[in-house]
Curated annotation (Swiss-Prot):
PANTHER family referenced in this protein's UniProt entry, alphabetically: IRON-SULFUR CLUSTER ASSEMBLY 2 HOMOLOG, MITOCHONDRIAL (PTHR43011:SF1)
Organism name: Mannheimia succiniciproducens (strain KCTC 0769BP / MBEL55E)
Pfam families in alphabetical order: Fe-S_biosyn
Cofactor: how bound: Binds 1 iron-sulfur cluster per subunit.
Protein name in the entry: Iron-sulfur cluster insertion protein ErpA
Keyword entries, A-Z: Iron, Iron-sulfur, Metal-binding
Length: 113
């Protein structure tokens, strides 16, 4: 991605957690896929899964040797956002900080635009 602005930030904390999970799974082909689906209390919700494939049109962002993959439909809702990993009172989880969301539910897993 030379001379191209990356439309989504993949934090060091998220990359470190993905790297540790890949080591646990013993599968170096795994990538973290973030996606948007309809649902949740605000209309859309974030999803995370491990995937071995990168489909045509997917955006791949690499940090510390691990890859984050986003499909084109989901990317349009995530531009300018950040995929992070947090540990706190609510437990540990991957989170999306999305500047495009006009409302977000209390748990942060669903949003509306």
């Amino acid at each position: 991605m030379t001379d191209m602005t990356i439309p989504l930030t993949f934090t060091d904390a998220a990359a470190k957690k993905v790297k540790n999970l890949i080591i646990e799974e013993e599968n170096q082909d795994l990538k973290l896929r973030v996606y948007i689906t309809g649902g949740g209390c605000s209309g859309f919700q974030y999803g995370f899964t491990f995937d071995e494939k990168v489909n045509d049109g997917d955006l791949t962002i690499e940090n510390d040797g691990v890859k984050l993959v986003i499909d084109p439909m989901s990317l349009q809702y995530l531009i300018g956002g950040t995929v992070d990993y947090t540990e706190g009172l609510e437990g540990s989880r991957f989170v999306v900080h999305n500047p495009n969301a006009t409302t977000t539910c209390g748990c942060g897993s669903s949003f509306s635009i």
